């Protein structure tokens, strides 16, 4: 996928400077090299939704998209929320009674403690496992668009999960989530996705953007479990 193809996919944004990163080790697939196209959203926040609709993702003040020359494994995926049909496993998962609180994007120590615990349990050797409080705060607080936090608690009041969410004109985007993995039977990560799908549906929006589906990465290939969904390939969204 070339820069030219990226520029064609956002032809209406031709006045926006699309920058290209240096090559680096791919964070998702071993022995792969990654290159990204990115846009500074702090200078052009109005472009975010159009970029998201062409497969870009947001991190802090930047929108980015992989444009690797020899790999197309990062496939943008969004759930068609109004038609979502949970399977039996998902129905059982969602039968739990968790409390959802909608919060502004402000970092706090309780969430950071859960984040660190999650990284230690699920991504022990990942780049984010050593994230400092300052960097975590940037991830949560730095957003040039409308964003929010979904916080999930059990009935006893313990925080079980947190999801950072961007608000788009056609739905929501799950930017990043983390949760308590101590009791695997709870499937908090799955619960948060189902609940956010239902939130999108209840608010008469269309999609929940889940980011990149990567078949070769078991930590990224769960996203096609939520049907129906669309994937972005060759410059268009196709139902799968």
Q: Could you say what each language-model-derived stretch is?
A:
Residues 2-3, 15, 20-27, 35-108:
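Acyl-donor-binding surface of acyltransferase catalytic domains
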Residues 62-69, 83-85, 92-185, 225:
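A conserved beta-strand-loop-helix scaffold within acyl/acetyltransferase catalytic domains
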Residues 185-197:
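Conserved acetyl-CoA-binding loop-helix of GNAT-fold acetyltransferases
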Residues 194-206:
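Conserved acyl-CoA
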